[in-house]
């Protein structure tokens, strides 16, 4: 199976996520919205509605790919492998992540701030209408660093150690967190369960990834010592138990400071500051972050394979 996952990564790097083709994540989102409406209308509490919605989405997201691969394997093992490759391909997003941040970079190179704000709004939830160039760069770097775990290394973790059905299960977990994991009036209770499950699912991959980011910064000639230092000093300051780790590692590697004031629907939100502002924000830091993300994705996958192979050998 490792070679199959490697092919999935290659397909993602070549094709990305074609917008005109059906995608499991969009189907998961539609299912989740329908179940949310049903259980909100038929449950005694928002917490129970959120738990039932989440568990049913998780179950369906696991069973469909699991049974599909089993059926394909019965027809021919090659069909099973091909289907597994395609399922895993849909759970990772290396190409899309790099492309989106590159679009922000291109707009900034053209000194087109309105376009850069529009492009960065596709990858962040904060208000972008009045962001300065430095704030756009910070938003782009923060989003890319955070999504390295959600969009790449965690689905690869479950693909390597569990297979395609587990990778899709994780994708459903992350999708529900994106839909419901907000601490506002509507989702504070309903979304608490999927948010906790997402934190749990990302816990180990986030920690592995953050240290591999330090290693990647060494190979790329960035400040790896500072990356390790900031990771250990600031990684746990973030409200999320996982997001701050990779953001801190990237901040240290690039010698910049992430976090600070953001606006969400006009409401000010202050995130802990990660890193020290040794350098001003520069457009090239977007490309440097992309290099870190790409190399870290490859090295993390190799690390997973080594652990999997070692465990298989001894067991």
Swiss-Prot record:
- Name one molecular function that GO assigns to this entry: ABC-type vitamin B12 transporter activity
Q: Known InterPro entries for this protein?
A: Cobalamin_biosynth_CobD/CbiB
Q: Which UniProt keywords apply?
A: Cell membrane, Cobalamin biosynthesis, Membrane, Transmembrane, Transmembrane helix
Q: Which Pfam families match?
A: CobD_Cbib
Membrane-traversing stretches: 48-70, 75-94, 148-170, 208-230, 292-314
UniProt membrane topology term: Multi-pass membrane protein
One GO location term (cellular component): plasma membrane
| Annotated localization | Cell membrane
Its UniProt pathway annotation is: Cofactor biosynthesis; adenosylcobalamin biosynthesis
Q: Carries keyword Methyltransferase?
A: no
Q: Which GO terms describe its biological process?
A: cobalamin biosynthetic process
Per the UniProt entry, the disulfide pairs are none
HAMAP family in the cross-refs: CobD_CbiB
Q: Tell me, in a sentence or two, what this protein's role is.
A: Converts cobyric acid to cobinamide by the addition of aminopropanol on the F carboxylic group.
**What family, per the record?**
Belongs to the CobD/CbiB family.
Q: What is this protein called?
A: Cobalamin biosynthesis protein CobD
What organism does this protein naturally occur in? Leptospira interrogans serogroup Icterohaemorrhagiae serovar Lai (strain 56601)
């Amino acid at each position: 199976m490792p070679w199959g996952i490697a092919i999935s990564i290659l397909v993602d790097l070549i094709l990305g996520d074609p917008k005109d083709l059906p995608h499991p994540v969009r189907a998961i989102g539609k299912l989740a919205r329908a179940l949310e409406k049903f259980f909100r209308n038929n449950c005694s509490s928002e917490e129970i509605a959120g738990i039932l919605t989440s568990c049913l989405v998780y179950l369906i997201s696991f069973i469909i790919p699991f049974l599909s691969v089993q059926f394909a394997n019965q027809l021919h093992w090659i069909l099973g492998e091909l289907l597994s490759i395609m399922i895993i391909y849909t759970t990772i997003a290396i190409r899309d992540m790099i492309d989106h941040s590159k679009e922000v970079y291109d707009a900034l190179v053209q000194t087109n701030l309105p376009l850069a704000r529009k492009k960065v709004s596709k990858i962040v939830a904060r208000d972008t209408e009045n962001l300065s160039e430095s704030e756009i760069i910070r938003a782009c770097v923060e989003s890319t660093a955070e999504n390295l775990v959600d969009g790449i290394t965690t689905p690869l973790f479950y693909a390597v150690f569990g297979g395609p059905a587990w990778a899709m299960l994780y994708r459903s977990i992350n999708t529900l967190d994106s839909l419901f994991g907000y601490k506002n009036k509507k989702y504070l209770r309903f979304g608490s369960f999927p948010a906790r499950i997402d934190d749990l699912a990302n816990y180990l991959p986030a920690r592995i990834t953050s240290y591999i980011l330090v290693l990647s910064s060494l190979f790329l000639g960035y400040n790896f010592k500072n990356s390790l230092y900031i990771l250990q000093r600031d990684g746990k300051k973030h409200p999320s138990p996982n997001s701050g780790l990779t953001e801190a590692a990237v901040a240290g590697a690039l010698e910049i400071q992430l976090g600070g004031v953001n606006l969400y629907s006009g409401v000010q939100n202050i995130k802990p500051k990660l890193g020290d502002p040794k350098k001003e924000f520069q457009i090239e830091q977007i490309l440097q972050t992309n290099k870190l993300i790409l190399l870290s994705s490859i090295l993390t996958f190799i690390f997973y394979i080594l652990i999997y192979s070692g465990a298989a050998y001894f067991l």
